[in-house]
Amino acid sequence: MERVLIVNADDFGLSKGQNYGIVEAYRNGVVTSTTALVNGEAIDHAAQLSRELPALGVGMHFVLTLGKPVSEMPGLTRDGLLGKWIWQMAEEDTLPLDEIAHELACQYQRFIDVFGREPTHLDSHHHVHMFPQIFPIVARFAAQRGIALRIDRQTVLNADDLPSDLRSTQGFSSEFYGEEITEACFLRILDASAHRGEASLEVMCHPAFVDNIIRQSAYCYPRLTELEVLTSASLKAAIAERGYRPGSFLDI
C-alpha cells in the first residue's frame, strides 16, 4: 500500500533564520509542507521565499499565544499581546470564543493577502486549536472552506459533531521534538504508523538556522539538530524504502 508522508515544518514567518531553515529542509531534505504565522516578524520574507517554491505546500499556523493578534482581542490579550496564559483561561473555561473565531477569520484573510492564495491547511502554534473549546470552531472553519486540518485523533477521539467533510491525515506525530531528535526516532514514527495501517501521516518538525529571534525561544538549538537530521541523505532513502510518497495536504 502506498502511503503519503507529509513532513510539515511549523513556524514559517517566525524569523528569517526559521524561514531559511525550512527552505533548506525542503530543497535538500524531506520537508514537504510548512505552516506560517501571519503575525510573525518575518512573514513577508516567508511569502517572498514561497513564491520561489510553488510546489511547497504552505498552510496557516493559527496563533493565539505569541505576538500581536490581527484583530482586537481585549478578552485574550494583555497589554495588546497574546501569551501562554491561554492555558489557564482554557482550564477556567473563560476563553473569549467569539474573539477567537473572529481572529481565525482575520488571520486567514491576512494569509491570503500576504501569500496571494489560500492556505493548504490549518494547524496552530502550541496546538491551541486542539483545546476542546477551540477545536469545534477551527474544524467548522476548515470544513466550510474545504481545507485540511491537523488533527491529533487521540485528543478528539470522543469529540462530538465533527464535520463529516473535514479532511486530515489518518496519522499525526509530534514526537520528532525535544531531546530525542534522531533519524531512528523519525523512522520509528513511520514504522508505528505503518503498523496501524494508516494511509497518510503528518510528522511535525521545526528546522531552523539560529538567529536573534530563535535564540529567544525556549526551543532554540534543537531546531538546528532537526535541520541536520531532516537533510540527511540516509533518512530520505529510508523513507523511500518504506514505501512512503512525499506529499502535501493537497494530496489527501
Curated annotation (Swiss-Prot):
CDD domains: YdjC_EF3048_like (cd10803). Its EC number is 3.5.1.105. It catalyses: N,N'-diacetylchitobiose + H2O = N-acetyl-beta-D-glucosaminyl-(1->4)-D-glucosamine + acetate; diacetylchitobiose-6'-phosphate + H2O = N'-monoacetylchitobiose-6'-phosphate + acetate. GO terms for molecular function: chitin disaccharide deacetylase activity; deacetylase activity; metal ion binding. Its cofactor is Mg(2+). Mg(2+) binds at H61, H125. Pathway: Glycan degradation; chitin degradation. Its main location: cytoplasm. Pfam families: YdjC (PF04794). Keywords: Carbohydrate metabolism, Chitin degradation, Cytoplasm, Hydrolase, Magnesium, Metal-binding, Polysaccharide degradation. Belongs to the YdjC deacetylase family. ChbG subfamily. Homodimer. NCBIfam families: PRK02134.1. Involved in the degradation of chitin. ChbG is essential for growth on the acetylated chitooligosaccharides chitobiose and chitotriose but is dispensable for growth on cellobiose and chitosan dimer, the deacetylated form of chitobiose. Deacetylation of chitobiose-6-P and chitotriose-6-P is necessary for both the activation of the chb promoter by the regulatory protein ChbR and the hydrolysis of phosphorylated beta-glucosides by the phospho-beta-glucosidase ChbF. This is Chitooligosaccharide deacetylase. The gene is chbG.
